[in-house]
A protein has these predicted regions:
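Short acidic-hydrophobic, aromatic-tinged amphipathic segments that line or gate anion-handling sites
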Residues: 27-34, 105-109, 141
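Conserved ATP-binding module of the ATP-grasp superfamily
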Residues: 100-103, 122-127, 141-179
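Short, charged, surface-exposed secondary-structure boundary motifs
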Residues: 23-24, 39, 82-88, 202-204
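Short beta-strand-to-turn element immediately C-terminal to the catalytic PLP-Schiff-base lysine
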Residues: 107, 138-143, 182-185, 192-193
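Phosphate-binding core of ATP-grasp and ATP-grasp-like enzymes
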Residues: 154-155, 173-213
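A conserved helix-loop-beta module that forms one wall/lid of the active-site cleft
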Residues: 75-137
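ATP-binding N-terminal substructure of ATP-dependent carboxylate-amine bond-forming enzymes
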Residues: 1-78
Length: 213
C-alpha cells in the first residue's frame, strides 16, 4: 500500500497475489517458485524494480536471476538468503561469530538424533527441520516419546521433504518471541519497529506451530 502511495510508481504487479492485495495491485497467476516464468514476465512487462519477499524464491536465487537480467531487486541473493533457508547454517554462523543463541546439536542420521535425545533427557526440547517448511518445521517435545516421534516425522517420514534431511535439536528457552527486522543497503542499517509473530494454532499459545500471524 505504501508503494501505491508513491506518485513515481505507475503500476504495481503482484504474483501470485490474493484477494486482499488485488485492491491495490494487479495480480497475475504465476507461482512464486516458478522462476523461469516469473523472470520472463518481468522482462516482458519491462518491470523497473522487483520486491522479492517469500522465502522459497529467495532461497532458489530469484534475486540473482533478475539482477543478471538487469532488473534491480529488493531482497537478499541466494548466498545471503541461506541464513533463513537453513537453520543449520544460521546456528553455525551464530556460533562462529559468538552471537548468543540456544544450545544445539545437528544431526543427519535419525538414530543418532534419538540416541542424543535419550542421553540428554531434558524437556521440553526443540526439534527443527533444517530447511524451509512454511513455518511448521519446528516441533516442541514435552517427553522422550514426543521427541522420538518428532525425529521420525522429520527425518524418516520426511513430513517436510528434503527440509528434514538434517535437523537441529535445540535447548528450549522461555519468554516472549520478538521479531526485529531492518533494512540495509550493505552499508547503513535502519531498524523497523519490533513485532511478535503469533505462530501457535490455538489460543493461550497452545497447539502446533503455523506460518504465523
Amino acid at each position: 500500500r505504501k508503494l501505491k502511495e508513491n506518485p513515481t510508481i505507475e503500476e504495481i504487479i503482484c504474483a501470485p497475489g490474493n484477494g486482499g492485495i488485488a485492491a491495490d495491485a494487479k495480480c497475475i497467476n504465476v507461482s512464486a517458485i516458478d522462476l523461469a516464468n516469473m523472470v520472463e514476465f518481468a522482462k516482458n512487462e519491462k518491470v523497473d524494480f522487483c520486491v522479492v519477499t517469500p522465502d522459497d524464491p529467495l532461497a532458489m536465487g530469484m534475486v540473482d536471476i533478475l539482477e543478471m537480467e538487469g532488473i534491480p531487486c529488493f531482497g537478499p541473493n541466494a548466498n545471503a538468503a541461506i541464513i533463513e533457508s537453513s537453520k543449520v547454517f544460521a546456528k553455525n554462523l551464530m556460533k562462529k561469530y559468538q552471537i548468543p543463541t540456544a544450545g544445539y546439536a545437528v544431526f543427519s542420521d535419525a538414530q543418532e538424533a534419538i540416541n542424543y535425545i535419550r542421553t540428554q533427557n531434558r524437556y521440553p526440547t526443540v526439534l527443527k527441520a533444517d530447511g524451509l517448511a512454511l513455518g511448521k518445521g519446528v516441533l516442541i517435545a514435552q517427553t522422550e516419546e514426543e521427541a522420538v516421534q518428532a525425529v521420525n516425522e522429520l527425518m524418516v517420514d520426511q513430513a517436510f521433504g528434503q527440509a528434514g534431511k538434517q535437523i537441529v535439536i535445540e535447548e528450549f528457552m522461555t519468554g516472549p518471541e520478538v521479531s526485529v527486522l531492518a533494512f540495509t543497503d550493505g552499508h547503513v542499517v535502519v531498524p523497523m519497529v519490533s513485532s511478535m509473530d503469533h505462530k501457535r494454532a490455538l489460543d493461550n499459545d497452545e497447539g502446533l506451530n503455523t506460518g504465523g500471524m
